[in-house]
């Protein structure tokens, strides 16, 4: 099957022991597992893009990472070099949501135009305006990231998206998922054959999905949707969005990609870098060499 884009999941840090209840709603006292932190590289047709950018291990980003036990952090320059890319090569960045581990390295991508849902940005500004007793709503948010995003608008480097948008790049669509993991989360579909009714779609879920259990439950003989364990919005919205994403992936849950799922390595080719981080290779465009073999 021909692919228009090469697709990689790039781990840039991790939490070695994350409670399972963060991955799966209600899974209390069910142990711990590794939680990779990652972003997606899309390369093809003369374009290099990413889905999210990770966080920067300085200031409040570093403080939050240390509070949550994040280890192994590497900057985009180091991580992207493993697939022959530099941050300056990236021309488009699709921000799934504004949590620090997805949006904290905005200033490391000097030539990129950034896409974010208008609701995601405006509601975090609103949340910052609330009195201190509402501060749980800001869990996972670095206020400096919000201000940097506003400044990107001043620089004319921000596209404020209102709902769904097709073909932001050829075969790449943005889909709103309001009031789910965050106020204005979105996910990204790559129709890698370029067809409108694609037989080769990949859905990049951001944090709408943390783990395979969110799409399949724990009983393979009787699958069900189970929400992630952390959300500003509703479990109902997360479940309905899981159904929508699965349909966009042609019913193949393995084509719905959660960057926090360590077990992607069991489904796709991967390797560990010298820094101890994993690259997972989902697809290779024509003429692209494997970065994991």
Model features per residue range: what roles?
Residues 66-116:
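Active-site metal-binding motif and surrounding structural segment of the metallo-beta-lactamase
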């Amino acid at each position: 099957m021909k692919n228009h884009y090469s697709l990689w999941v790039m781990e840039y840090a991790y939490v070695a022991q994350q409670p399972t209840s963060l991955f799966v709603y209600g899974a209390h006292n069910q142990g711990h597992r590794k939680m990779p932190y990652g972003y997606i590289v899309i390369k093809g047709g003369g374009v290099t893009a990413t889905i999210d950018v990770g966080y920067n291990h300085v200031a409040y980003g570093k403080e939050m990472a240390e509070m949550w036990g994040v280890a192994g952090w590497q900057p985009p320059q180091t991580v992207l070099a493993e697939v022959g890319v530099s941050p300056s090569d990236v021309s488009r960045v699709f921000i799934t949501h504004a949590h620090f581990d997805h949006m904290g390295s905005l200033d490391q991508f000097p030539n990129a135009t950034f896409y974010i849902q208008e609701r995601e940005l405006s509601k975090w500004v609103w949340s910052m305006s609330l009195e201190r007793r509402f501060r749980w709503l800001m869990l996972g948010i670095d206020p400096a990231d919000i201000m940097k995003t506003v400044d990107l608008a001043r620089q004319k480097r921000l596209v404020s998206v209102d709902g769904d948008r097709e073909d932001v790049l050829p075969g790449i669509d943005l889909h709103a998922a309001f009031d789910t993991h965050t106020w204005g989360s979105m996910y990204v579909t790559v129709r890698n054959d370029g067809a409108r009714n694609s037989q080769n779609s990949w859905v990049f879920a951001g944090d709408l999905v943390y783990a395979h259990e969110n799409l399949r439950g724990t009983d393979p003989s009787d699958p069900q949707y189970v929400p992630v364990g952390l959300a500003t919005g509703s479990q109902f919205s997360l479940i309905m969005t899981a159904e929508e994403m699965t349909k966009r992936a042609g019913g193949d849950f393995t084509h719905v990609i959660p960057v926090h799922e360590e077990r992607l390595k069991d489904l796709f080719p991967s390797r560990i870098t010298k820094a101890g981080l994993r690259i997972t290779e989902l697809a290779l465009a024509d003429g692209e060499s494997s970065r994991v073999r």
